Amino acid sequence: ALSSLVRIGTSTWTYEGWQGQVYTRPYAKSTFARECLGEYCQYQYKNEPLFRTVGNDATFYRPPTANQLRRYLNQIPEDFEMCFKVWEKITIPSYAKQPRYGSRAGQPNPRFLDAKLFNELVLTPYRDAKFEPHTGPLLFEFQRHGLSTDEFCARLDGFFSQLPQDFRYAVEVRNAGL
């Protein structure tokens, strides 16, 4: 058996291409993402559940709601953890020139590494849903940022010093300059 310290999972559970492999139950396209998490958690390898964690990158675009987290609780086993990407409003120093940002496109992000916003809008749903025992590392993805390495590290250090210690955090830097 695999050590209990090791968790195997994937970056998402919502890959429809796994139907017939990981997923054996039929799912309507409209409800697939909401309903298949429980079956993902039950997937067996050598008569043992294989997946004990999964990522959720949809939370990069908006924080989860307490109701979403409660729906997950109804589908996951007691020892299962989910890793969530942190909302981009916290992790991007300026908005890319993309239509999805509307009037903010190309503008600085005044909420970059805003610990108060993170505590209020990102962490609160986890607490309200009592999801903390199932929360794996919260993943901060940083892409291009236009800051010097020293400035970025100083801002990051200041930010993390304001966060509660009862959650775990991870940083993914997608910037060749660092």
State what each model feature region is:
Residues A1-L178:
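Residues lining hydrophobic/aromatic ligand-binding pockets adjacent to catalytic sites
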